[in-house]
């Protein structure tokens, strides 16, 4: 007996077979994705990126693979205004150079004294020299002449004498060992009197120097009320040149050098800068920590005059003669 072929059942069977094949393939793909999923690296801000890259293309026309940039931050002053600032490279050795360096037993002087200069042909007649062999850093020649000329004009006196500068005089009137004398940035003052050479105390008419020295960049290095910070007793005759804006800031805030170098660290190129106007000139000052044993990229203004001094501790102090702003002393 002949059976009739059931095409309906055949179609259903084929459909089931096809669904079974697709189901098996779907399961296979899912298992592959599960066991071969690429790990992800979380980035700042919550975004992510795969740690694998399909391909890396060399820049066209270079002829060689590029070297990845160093990830070490050598500026130590990230976040500064790139519209106003650029950077200059400073080796770590220059931390020990400049008028703001702290020199003592903990921070010895590392300079060579190559910038010392004599007063030959540069000294005016408003002050005296103990001997013509005295030398100072060349930066002091003009402010010393200017300060004593103004002092002489104000008081009529011309008997202030430079007793010593960059050397220690064992057995002399000022025989206290002061390591910073090596820098050439300091002077010991005395008075030429009828009965010989006397100590400078800053009394009477000579108080003009005590009151006005900061206008010429000088400070009394070891005040009597700063012994705990400086480690030395008061020296009324010993003056240090730190440049005009720093001398003014130290006087305004009643700071000795040790305290000032700590205080100025709060001022940065990316934040607030210390600001002061002296003799009609507006200055901004900020601190940049040095990269230990490496070159530091120090932010400096693109359009304003500036100077950089190390502190002999671990950083640089930038002084900007700015064309904007203004603040009274």
What residue ranges belong to the model's regions?
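Extracytoplasmic cell-surface/polysaccharide-interacting catalytic and binding patches
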Residues: 2-235, 239-329
């Amino acid at each position: 007996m002949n059976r009739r072929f059931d095409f309906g059942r055949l179609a259903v069977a084929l459909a089931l077979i096809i669904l079974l094949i697709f189901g098996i393939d779907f399961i296979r793909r899912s298992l592959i994705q599960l066991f071969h999923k690429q790990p992800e690296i979380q980035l700042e801000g919550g975004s992510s990126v795969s740690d694998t890259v399909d391909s890396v293309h060399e820049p066209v026309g270079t002829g060689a693979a590029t070297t990845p940039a160093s990830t070490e931050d050598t500026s130590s002053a990230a976040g500064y205004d790139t519209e106003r600032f650029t950077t200059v490279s400073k080796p770590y050795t220059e931390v020990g150079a400049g008028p703001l360096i702290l020199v003592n037993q903990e921070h010895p002087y590392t300079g060579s004294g190559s910038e010392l200069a004599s007063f030959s042909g540069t000294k005016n007649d408003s002050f005296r020299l103990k001997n013509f062999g005295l030398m100072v850093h060349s930066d002091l020649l003009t402010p010393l002449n200017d300060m004593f000329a103004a002092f002489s004009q104000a008081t009529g006196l011309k008997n202030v004498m430079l007793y010593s500068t960059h050397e220690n005089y064992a057995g002399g009137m000022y025989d206290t060992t002061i390591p910073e004398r090596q820098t050439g940035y300091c002077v010991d003052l005395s008075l030429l009197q009828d009965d010989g050479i006397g100590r400078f105390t800053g009394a009477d008419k000579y108080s003009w120097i005590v009151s006005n020295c900061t206008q010429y960049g000088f400070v009394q290095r070891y005040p009597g009320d700063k012994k705990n910070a400086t480690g030395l007793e008061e020296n009324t005759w010993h003056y240090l040149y730190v440049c005009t804006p720093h001398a003014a800031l130290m006087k305004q805030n009643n700071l000795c050098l040790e305290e000032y170098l700590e205080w100025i660290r709060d001022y940065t190129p990316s934040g607030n800068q210390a600001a002061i106007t002296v003799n009609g000139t507006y200055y901004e000052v900020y601190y940049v920590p040095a990269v230990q044993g490496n070159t530091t990229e120090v932010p400096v203004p693109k359009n304003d005059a500036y100077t950089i001094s190390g502190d002999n501790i671990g950083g640089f102090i930038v002084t900007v003669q700015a064309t904007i702003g203004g603040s009274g002393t």
